[in-house]
Amino acid sequence: MSMLFYTLITAFLIGIQAELHSESNVPAGHTIPQAHWTKLQHSLDTALRRARSAPAAAIAARVAGQTRNITVDPRLFKKRRLRSPRVLFSTQPPPEAADTQDLDFEVGGAAPFNRTHRSKRSSSHPIFHRGEFSVCDSVSVWVGDKTTATDIKGKEVMVLGEVNINNSVFKQYFFETKCRDPNPVDSGCRGIDSKHWNSYCTTTHTFVKALTMDGKQAAWRFIRIDTACVCVLSRKAVRRA
């Protein structure tokens, strides 16, 4: 919006300069009609009203829609170094967090390009038995509306929400895990001896390969996402008599 405003102001100043230039070339005894100035002012007011009335959501939608025109070669997803179990390109929403152990679902008649074997790794994961608890409570969700992220150099980059692959629009999803509550119990982490330890739960991060915008082209970058919830401990100071 600010860029459009400055553009309109620049056009207005150029118009004024043009009018002044034409006025200097007018023969003596003649004046510029007031109608010219009125018309110029009216044009500027109309343009400014249209700029202010344009919904921000509509402008954002047009910008987001441009990513659909970015075509990606599907052969890129066959490179093992670009795969990540936490990044998924799909034409439909992935299963809920409770069902993320199986990513072998069909998408538009074909499996996702970067589908992984998370189910094989998760099948051997121990199931919590009755009476067993985690020191921290976490929640895992598929995030499909990520627009910006921090890359491995600490710079904020634009994340591609959608790309065109084989004439189909695929959305980029990220499987993120974060803490549900920094203090699951009053003393901090669950099961920690609060008499001798201070504790709290915190979300940790890792870097995954994701498609981002580099100028007007798509580029792979390492971006930071939430991946775990861990307990942080610090020993309490010993009080000496």
Swiss-Prot record:
One of its GO terms (cellular component) is endosome lumen. Keywords: Cleavage on pair of basic residues, Disulfide bond, Endosome, Glycoprotein, Growth factor, Lipid-binding, Metalloenzyme inhibitor, Metalloprotease inhibitor, Protease inhibitor, Secreted, Signal. The keyword Cell cycle does not apply. One of its GO terms (molecular function) is nerve growth factor receptor binding. A 1-acyl-sn-glycero-3-phospho-L-serine binds at residue 209. Homodimer. The homodimer interacts with a single NTRK1 chain. The homodimer interacts with a single NGFR chain. The NGF dimer interacts with a single SORCS2 chain (via extracellular domain). The NGF precursor (proNGF) binds to a receptor complex formed by SORT1 and NGFR, which leads to NGF endocytosis. Both mature NGF and the immature NGF precursor (proNGF) interact with SORCS2 and with the heterodimer formed by SORCS2 and NGFR (via extracellular domains). The NGF precursor (proNGF) has much higher affinity for SORCS2 than mature NGF. Nerve growth factor is important for the development and maintenance of the sympathetic and sensory nervous systems. Extracellular ligand for the NTRK1 and NGFR receptors, activates cellular signaling cascades to regulate neuronal proliferation, differentiation and survival. The immature NGF precursor (proNGF) functions as a ligand for the heterodimeric receptor formed by SORCS2 and NGFR, and activates cellular signaling cascades that lead to inactivation of RAC1 and/or RAC2, reorganization of the actin cytoskeleton and neuronal growth cone collapse. This is Beta-nerve growth factor.
